[in-house]
Structures are given as structure tokens and as C-alpha cells.
């Protein structure tokens, strides 16, 4: 059964107790930020725009800030842990491998957002504080979410620097691609333990005033061997969308079970990146060495019958293994990378939307079977 709740953005904004401007950054804790920055530059077409490290006074960590459109990644490695934050990052990489430590959200008032969140049950991991330099002032605060992930609340209204105070502008690592690869971060998906999905959905409902956008349970989100459940929470403007998955009992180990085992607990499973031209994006990324999940040719034999006309011909979708889905609002095109590190944990989705604000419900079976084939190769099904 699938339940869908549609929003009326204008009404939602008027009553929004926790207004947001959008995703500020996805912050990764990684073993080698310099190499990771090179990978995301060459493989994903991201552009280095800012840096913080020993050369400009940061003795404990090195961080590389990469952007493409409004999508921003921050890749951070510990050089020599000396503070609780440095030890936390080092322990995070040791336990989880490379992974997302922070889904930072831009807000118009970080102090008010933090106060509202704490009043409604969130755990603070950083009280509101200011960072200043010649570019202005940024106000930040942070709250905990599932696993060891946090949400830093960022108010950069009075700031025009390259990222945050303490960072300096940096030149791209490689020649920027001829075409912008991505437009924005579309959504960020979290995996949580069995029986805890509703707990975390309730957390976002209560702490951030987010509402339930979609729900996927039962046959919609199962194969012959594995199953999971998923609910999507979003702010009133739909700028910030967080699907939350949990495993369901089935014959074999699901992709969520595999993630939880190898990540060592709950965390961010994948980041969806919005593109205006998925064909160009996938061709460019494939040429740069990014591996995508495979889709059997049989998927495309009847695709045109139930999806209808799309911007991209079915033959091109078949060639590139891109999935398509249609709902009452329009259609979307999507494809998923394989995990981008040796642990079968974090991966990416590329999505092109044409009216649809869905998540590819019609593709779930094909997608999960593709993931199961990869699990079987790894001996984890």
C-alpha cells in the first residue's frame, strides 16, 4: 500500500514553525580528503571552491569544499586529532568508513531554529555560535539525528565568503566540465534499524515541523527475496526531503540490512542529485569511470506503454540503463551508482524531474533486483 500526501507550499510556508532555505551542504568524514576531492572532481564534475587545512591555520583537519550548481559537498579528514571534534571524525571513519557525518541545512535564523528543535525534543550537539572573518558572520548550531549523523543549522545571511570563516577560496582541481553536471541536491536518504523508521519520522515531524510526503510499504517495495519500508519527510517548500528506510522481514538480507551491517549502524545511504540533462550527465560520469547499476533489457520492452512519452527516447534509456517512472504530476528519469567506496554503503542517485515529485515507485522492483544482483556478487544476499 502506498499513501501520498501532497503539500500546498504557500500555506505550508505561512505556518512553518521551522523555516528552511534548503540544503546547505553534505559533509563527509573520509580517510583521505585530498584523494576524495580529486575523485569527486574528476568523476562527478564537482568544482573545488574552498579549502581549510594546515596552510591556513587548521592544524587538526583538512577540508575541501566542492560544488556543482547549488549542490555542495564538504570532504573532511583528520590530520592529527586534538579536540573532541577531531577524535569524533577519526572514530567515525574507523567505525563507518567514508560516510556522511552532517546533513547541513540553511536556515534564516539558526538560533531560533535550534531553540525550536531543542524545545521539541532534539539533542543539541552544538549550541548557537558565530564565526567571523572579512566576509561577514555566519551563525551555526547543530542537533543530532539518526546514528552518528547531525544537522548543522547554518545562517549565512550576513556572509559572502566562499564557504565559512576559516576557509579560503581554492581553484578547481581539474578543468571544469563543459556542462554543469548537477543542479542541486534533490533528497538525502537515511537507513535506520528495524522498528525505528516511525521513531525518526516522528522526530522530523516534531522537531522540524516536517510533514510526511510519501510512504512505501508492502508489495510496492519488495522482491521475491528481500523487503524494506520507507517514509519520506519534507519541509513545507519541498526544498529539503529526507526519505527514511528500515529493513523488513524477508527470506534474505535486504540492501538495508547489508548497509547497517557494513556501516555499523544507522546513517545516510544515498544522496540524490538533480540534473537538467540526465543523458549528458550519465555519459560524462561513465566516461570518467563512475559505475552504475545495471538494468535488464527486458525492463525497457514495455516501458513506453506505461510511462508514455518522455524527453529521452526509450532506446537511449535502454542504452544508458536509465529508469523512468510516471505519476499523476508528471514523470522522472533516474539512475543509481554502485557504492562509491569498498564498503557497500554510500551511493548516489541521478534524477531528472518533469513535474513528478515522486521517488520512482514504479522502478522499485527493478532497482532492488539490480541491487540484489550486486549483493550476491559480494556474498551478502
Swiss-Prot record:
Pfam families named in the record: Glyoxalase
Cofactor(s) demanded: Fe cation
Positions contributing to Fe cation binding: 187, 270, 349
UniProt pathway annotation: Amino-acid degradation; L-phenylalanine degradation; acetoacetate and fumarate from L-phenylalanine: step 3/6
Keywords for the protein's UniProt record, in alphabetical order: Dioxygenase, Iron, Metal-binding, Oxidoreductase, Phenylalanine catabolism, Repeat, Tyrosine catabolism
Transmembrane domains' residue ranges: none
The protein's enzyme class: oxidoreductase
One Gene Ontology term from the biological process aspect of the record: L-phenylalanine catabolic process
PROSITE patterns for the chain: VOC
Entry-linked InterPro entries: 4OHPhenylPyrv_dOase, 4OHPhenylPyrv_dOase_C, 4OHPhenylPyrv_dOase_N, Glyas_Bleomycin-R_OHBP_Dase, Glyas_Fos-R_dOase_dom, VOC
Record has Repeat as a keyword: yes
Domain VOC: 22-156, 184-338
Cofactor notes: Binds 1 Fe cation per subunit.
Molecular function GO terms recorded: 4-hydroxyphenylpyruvate dioxygenase activity; metal ion binding
EC number of this enzyme: 1.13.11.27
Catalytic activity: 3-(4-hydroxyphenyl)pyruvate + O2 = homogentisate + CO2
Family the UniProt entry places it in: Belongs to the 4HPPD family.
Subunit structure: Homodimer.
Name under which the protein is recorded: 4-hydroxyphenylpyruvate dioxygenase
Lineage: Bacteria, Bacillati, Actinomycetota, Actinomycetes, Kitasatosporales
Amino acid at each position: 500500500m502506498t499513501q501520498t500526501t501532497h503539500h500546498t507550499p504557500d500555506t505550508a510556508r505561512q505556518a512553518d514553525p521551522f523555516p528552511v532555505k534548503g540544503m546547505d551542504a553534505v559533509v563527509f568524514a573520509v580517510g583521505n580528503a585530498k584523494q576524495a576531492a580529486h575523485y569527486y572532481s574528476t568523476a562527478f564534475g564537482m568544482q573545488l571552491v574552498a579549502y581549510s587545512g594546515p596552510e591556513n591555520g587548521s592544524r587538526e583537519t583538512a577540508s575541501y569544499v566542492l560544488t556543482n550548481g547549488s549542490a555542495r559537498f564538504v570532504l573532511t579528514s583528520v590530520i592529527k586529532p586534538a579536540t573532541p571534534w577531531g577524535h569524533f571524525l577519526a572514530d567515525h571513519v574507523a567505525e563507518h568508513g567514508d560516510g556522511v557525518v552532517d546533513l547541513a541545512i540553511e536556515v534564516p535564523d539558526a538560533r531560533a531554529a535550534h531553540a525550536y528543535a531543542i524545545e521539541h525534543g532534539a539533542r543539541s550537539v552544538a549550541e548557537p555560535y558565530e564565526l567571523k572573518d572579512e566576509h561577514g558572520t555566519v551563525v551555526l548550531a547543530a542537533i543530532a539525528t539518526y546514528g552518528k549523523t547531525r544537522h548543522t543549522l547554518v545562517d549565512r545571511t550576513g556572509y559572502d565568503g566562499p564557504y565559512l570563516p576559516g576557509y579560503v577560496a581554492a581553484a578547481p582541481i581539474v578543468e571544469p566540465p563543459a556542462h554543469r553536471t548537477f543542479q542541486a541536491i534533490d533528497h538525502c536518504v537515511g537507513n535506520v534499524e528495524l522498528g525505528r523508521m516511525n521513531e525518526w519520522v516522528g522526530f522530523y515531524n516534531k522537531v522540524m515541523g516536517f510533514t510526511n510526503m510519501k510512504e512505501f510499504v508492502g508489495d510496492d517495495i519488495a522482491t521475491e527475496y528481500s523487503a524494506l519500508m520507507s517514509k519520506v519527510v519534507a519541509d513545507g517548500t519541498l526544498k529539503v526531503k529526507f526519505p527514511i528506510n528500515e529493513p523488513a522481514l524477508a527470506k534474505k538480507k535486504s540492501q538495508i540490512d547489508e548497509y547497517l551491517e557494513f556501516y555499523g549502524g544507522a546513517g545516510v545511504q544515498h544522496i540524490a542529485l538533480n540534473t537538467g540533462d540526465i543523458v549528458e550527465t550519465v555519459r560524462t560520469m561513465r566516461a570518467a569511470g563512475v559505475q552504475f547499476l545495471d538494468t535488464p533489457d527486458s525492463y525497457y520492452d514495455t516501458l513506453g506503454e506505461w510511462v508514455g512519452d518522455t524527453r529521452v527516447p526509450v532506446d537511449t534509456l535502454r542504452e544508458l540503463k536509465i529508469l523512468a517512472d510516471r505519476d499523476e504530476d508528471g514523470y522522472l528519469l533516474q539512475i543509481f551508482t554502485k557504492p562509491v567506496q569498498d564498503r557497500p554503503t554510500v551511493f548516489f542517485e541521478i534524477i531528472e524531474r518533469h513535474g513528478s515529485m515522486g521517488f520512482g515507485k514504479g522502478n522499485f522492483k527493478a532497482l532492488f533486483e539490480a541491487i540484489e544482483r550486486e549483493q550476491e556478487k559480494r556474498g551478502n544476499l
